[in-house]
Amino acid sequence: MAGAVLLLPLLACGERKAQAQTSVPTTQTNEQGCTRQRSIGPQDPFQNPPPLKQACVGPYLLEIPQHLFYNQMGTEFDGSFSLVLQYPGLQPFAPGERMNLKLDVSMRTVAFAYWYIDRIELRQAMRNAYIPIWGDPEDPSRTLEGRIAGEPVYGLLPYYADLPRIRAYKARQGMRADAPVMKADWHQDWFITRDAAGEVDRLIRCTSREVGGTGVVFRDGLMYRHMQEPYSECQHQFMLPEHSTLVRISYVRFGLKDWQQIEAKARALFFDHLVSPHQ
């Protein structure tokens, strides 16, 4: 009888564990009403062919092969995600190739993030990237007007970081001459395009040209980190107006010349995997 009494708590504990296991939600719905199937339990990033995983961008549901996700397993627990291709070919990484991420694989990565904008107008979200909404508007590193306008390059209008002007401004703010913010690699050159109304509809911010070098070397068609040169990268931002979505892409600055192909891939990754609602 005593043994049976001792078993009762153990049985109750086992029952609670079983209930906890069966109560894990298999779907997740975001604020905009998009419901996606969650990936429950261990995931195999090496699975080939890769299974489809669901992701939401605002109200839009996408179904994407899992090897295209940054972690090659699907969304994060909260539904956030980014997608990846590799430069220069803009092809997918092989299933599992990004596990134990190596420096060269990381450097080849072109990462795509999609942000649904509904709290403010999409155009305003774009403006916030190049018109200061906080801090000192006189800081020449934070405005188009504080930069050096250059001749068009790759179909883009460049606004280079004016490092002497920036350093003079920072010195007036009390910064030491050897402070990190005084160094070229702290700052970015901006490249823009404008729409018919003159509004900036694309912004690409890259490590300052004053850093020099590309930071990359090619062997057998693959790109590797050039350890004797500094590394430069770009952050590329544009809009999908009809879907109220801001797209942000990161890649090595050497890839700036291919920005149009990279942007076309960003669009394809979204629209080719869009399930609902169709627009």
Task: Show the residue positions of the predicted features.
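Long, compositionally biased interface segments
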Residues: 213-279
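Residue-level signal for mature regions of secreted extracellular proteins and peptides
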Residues: 6-7, 27, 199, 227
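Bacterial N-terminal signal peptides
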Residues: 2-10
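Bacterial signal peptide processing site
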Residues: 14-16
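N-terminal export/ancillary region detector
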Residues: 18-193
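Sequence-level motif detector for i,i+2 pairs with an aromatic at +2
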Residues: 52, 59, 201, 242-244
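Catalytic cores of processing enzymes, dominated by hydrolases/peptidases
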Residues: 169-230
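Extracellular secreted precursors and ectodomains with disulfide-bonded cysteine-rich loops/domains
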Residues: 11, 32-33, 54, 204, ...
